């Protein structure tokens, strides 16, 4: 008996294609005389849709809700295996955390794939920036957004959703090549059928996802994240996943791996390519082979296909004309475009895309690969805000006219659910284009596609918990040094500690936010996974 847990809904383009997956799975598992049931659905929130809206304050919490919903779906104790259908930021980590609570079950993940490329990410970002300057009308902005996000499938930039798929394939928890096949590609249905057949076969083996997910598999996931400069969100997501699997992972671990992991991709926001181009020029098969050959990943792991991550170094081929079955080509040994994907011997950088910053303000995460070298070091006065909209208003009113370190505090997990502050990117990018040196420091999140502006995010301890951010004043001199990994407030320690903590804005209610008060009271800090489990 196979249990299906799905994040299907009609709101998210990434999840809409999954409407017919349960029927396909049920049909396929009947062939070996098995049965599949739809065990349960889980919610799926899109941070792109909820940017700047009340729902963004529920986004972080939704991951743990999804984990609990997954556990409820599987708790009937009927199942011998599980199929997880999900794609986006919180959804895959939540499904994985919930699945690990049933570690005895063989479990396979199946995504829907990216939408075909539309308006390029570079053009989209430029129009957003022009709109922030008042040069593009709202209707033109809407046209651009509709041209970029124009059909079913995952967003094509390399943000949290596509990072999820990269990491799951690097962990061997999906069928090889499944990460980036588009929804309407005929291979997508065959991949879903192959996963269905495979999970039935795995029910005859003694091990499940709990045994597979060991420290080597977790390291492989983080190396894949760093080699592709994936989503900053996953510095919290995979810490929480590691804990669900029984391991402790720290930001120091991630930073240490980043120092020795080369950056091999030029995907937006680190470059101009999207995931469709990445898949076309070599994709995960090339990337994983390069990292394995360089000794940067563990091959001695168990995957849903069997022993060894090297099983994932063959590329998905075209469908056989006569067989209508999936085919694989031998190991991909050359990238078809070095502006998109490079070998270990010719990396974009000798270090990975994410960096840990530390100092007397706490510690923070930064996506260094998206920041040009000339913008990586700044010492400037602080401009302190509590809300994203306050920053945008100040920029529009030309109140930020000199080099500045913008502080947005009281946006952490216990303060207000750690919302993404991606609307800051266009506004602060305008300041960069005016020749100013600008950096951002916040205890909130940015998008998985954060770029251009040096953004020290996920600051911990957060302001609401008495962290240093709560005692920073306008005009204090602050240094953000991305290269050395330094975050420094140039205020005497005694003076800083003698200051009163700034008031924490009261958590807002309405739009369902009042239902999540228990999360505010019990959530762990960002570097421990920002989770209510095991705090």
Where are the regions a protein language model picked out?
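Catalytic or ion-coupling anion/metal-binding cores of large enzyme and transporter domains
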Residues: 1-10, 14, 23-42, 53-55, ...
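Glycine-rich beta-alpha loop segments
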Residues: 18
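Contiguous domain-boundary segments centered on the initiation and propagation of an alpha-helix
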Residues: 63-71, 75-82, 392-400, 405-407
